[in-house]
């Protein structure tokens, strides 16, 4: 296993070990009410209690998050490329998006519920709306600030603007696009949980809310860990795809080890 992977997974194992030891010490010394800080064993037991509903919760939440993320990714990359490569599109579209972008996405959640109801559509569109902006901004910046010398050289040698875009602008913007996709994925899960906490009868966020009503902190932590693990897996998949697409890009010193 590469050295960096050992360090990464070792840090996670160390954090879990510290949590476990602190829980054991706290149970003996009663520094804090043990019900408020369950141990990893308590959390695993809570997950086992929910074993019959967890698969469905994961499937429902994943479907919502991925549907919203897919919409955001398509629109964000397309509009980012359009505004980054066209001054007219930039002048017309970008000011409107920049006006909306500073508003916290959750401020629109009540509006989306009124417009689209409490069903799946409002949650999926809310996720798409929240993830769109980070994807758009990163794509726009990557395309807009592609190497101007290479662009001028390509155009002076007779390349069309379309060809220059696909051979220079888009490849050079790919790292920024993937940065936006990773941030968008994180935003998707953030808004997903918030939406499920407020207006859902299934999903991982709803299960956390149900645990709050029951004052089951062990189940609440289990739900949070569950979301973190799924997010980590999805981020790793995105990182793997990015590494394959950017195999041509020089790596930083020591990155491959």
Identify the role of each PLM range.
Residues 2, 25-73:
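Periplasmic/extracellular loop-to-transmembrane helix junction in inner-membrane transport proteins
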Residues 2-28:
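N-terminal signal-anchor transmembrane alpha helix
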Residues 68-97:
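Transmembrane-helix boundary motif in ABC transporter permease subunits
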Residues 87, 175, 179, 221-257:
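C-terminal transmembrane helix and the adjacent membrane-cytosol boundary/short C-terminal tail
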Residues 98-134, 141-142:
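Generic hydrophobic transmembrane alpha-helix motif, especially the helices
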Residues 114, 143, 190-227, 246-256:
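Glycine-rich helix-loop "coupling/hinge" segments at transmembrane-helix boundaries
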Residues 125, 129, 161-195, 222, ...:
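Transmembrane alpha-helices
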Residues 142-183, 204, 208:
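Short cytoplasmic-facing helical segments at TM-TM junctions of multi-pass membrane proteins
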